[in-house]
């Protein structure tokens, strides 16, 4: 029983570490996207944003992806593009 608990704790620690790595990757990508957007001319920036939003609309997943997940992704992308980090 103790071995089982120890194994579960090790697996939990590994999952937590993986989660931290994913958060760091997402934050790094946010910083890069924000920096790139800030370097673009306003018209180019708007054209890129519209292109990305249009591509997202065209790529809406089918019924195999929950609607809530799809909407969350779209909201996050819109937030990142329209209101980038400071």
UniProtKB/Swiss-Prot annotation:
The keyword Cell division does not apply. It is found in: Cytoplasm. Keywords: Coiled coil, Cytoplasm, Stress response. The keyword Membrane does not apply. Residues 1-42 form a coiled coil. One of its GO terms (biological process) is cellular response to starvation. One of its GO terms (cellular component) is cytoplasm. Its main location: cytoplasm. Interacts with RssB. HAMAP family: Anti_adapt_IraP. Belongs to the IraP family. Inhibits RpoS proteolysis by regulating RssB activity, thereby increasing the stability of the sigma stress factor RpoS especially during phosphate starvation, but also in stationary phase and during nitrogen starvation. Its effect on RpoS stability is due to its interaction with RssB, which probably blocks the interaction of RssB with RpoS, and the consequent delivery of the RssB-RpoS complex to the ClpXP protein degradation pathway. This is Anti-adapter protein IraP. It comes from Enterobacter sp. (strain 638). The lineage of its organism: Bacteria, Pseudomonadati, Pseudomonadota, Gammaproteobacteria, Enterobacterales.
């Amino acid at each position: 029983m103790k071995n089982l608990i120890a194994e579960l704790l090790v697996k939990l620690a590994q999952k937590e570490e993986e989660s931290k790595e994913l958060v760091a990757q997402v934050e790094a990508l946010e910083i890069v996207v924000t920096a790139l957007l800030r370097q673009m001319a306003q018209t180019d920036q708007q054209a890129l944003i519209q292109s990305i939003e249009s591509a997202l609309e065209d790529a809406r997943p089918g019924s195999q992806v929950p609607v809530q997940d799809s909407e969350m992704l779209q909201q996050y992308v819109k937030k990142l593009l329209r209101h980038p980090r400071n």
